[in-house]
Amino acid sequence: MAAGKLLLYAGLSLSLCALGMLAVAICSDHWYETDARRYRERCRSFSSRRKDPGFIYIPNNSLPLRASRSRLDRWEEKLLLARNRRQLFAMSAADECSKRYNSTNMGLWSKCHRLGFDQEIEDLIRNGSIARCSYIKYHYSSATIPKDLSYNITKTIRQDEWHSLHLRRMTAGFMGMAVAIILFGWIIGMLGCCWDRGLMQYVAGLLFLMGGTFCIISLCTCVAGINFELSRYPRYIYGLPDDISHGYGWSMFCAWGGLGLSLIAGFFCTLAPSVQPIPRSTCPKSRQENGTVC
């Protein structure tokens, strides 16, 4: 009896912690973060080079005066690959620096400039020229599609926009359903604990497992959406330069923690009724003898 109660109380406590972690993850804006400080430094050094007529800038690593022939061959191959890549994707150093990349953090509802990463952005925000955060759209809008592109590229971008929009909707929708199901399961579990109903406790555990499943779907679609955005065509519009570091923030790990706690809570609550002994009635059962009921 004590083991069953302990499992039930532990499951309800873990489910409440899972609700808190998922709520924090939903309300925060640190699911995905980018750091463009190295990119800014490279572009500043690129813009500060000499631009005199007839002056050709050649970096030191392009002058292998003491290199062997094999190293020269490997270096020429690397230069050829880099040149082909820039011709294919139009991502030369000048092209990369002509586009402005900022250090941002993104959540389910908004995308914000990171605090203290760029003094120019901080001054613009302080003056009211730009807002720190912009809302993420969950409806289709053609305003974000560049106008000076060919028809085939524009069609590809439009299809990718729809696909990215569906992934964002699935991420937010399944995360909201996961929180609602876990909350409903916690209410059912509390009622089953107060009324000592094993069936309600078992149903609460199943709801916790279902909420964890929905949370898995939401997180997987979130990761798929981020990877899809990074691999969109054309790369010179949607890709990131190599010196911009990016990765998942603490909100994503908070959501994964809530997922794990909800699954553990579901396991505990479904196991609790089977551990508790079946209550025996003190009243003897009536039996039928010789056509009469005793």
Curated annotation (Swiss-Prot):
Gene3D superfamilies: 1.20.140.150
Subcellular location: Membrane
Gene Ontology cellular component list: membrane
Keyword annotations: Membrane, Signal, Transmembrane, Transmembrane helix
Pfam families tied to this protein: Claudin_2
Protein topology in the membrane: Multi-pass membrane protein
Keyword Membrane in record: yes
Signal peptide: 1-23
Superkingdom of the source species: Eukaryota
TM region positions: 172-192, 206-226, 252-272
Protein family (similarity comment): Belongs to the TMEM178 family.
Protein name, as recorded: Transmembrane protein 178B
Organism: Danio rerio
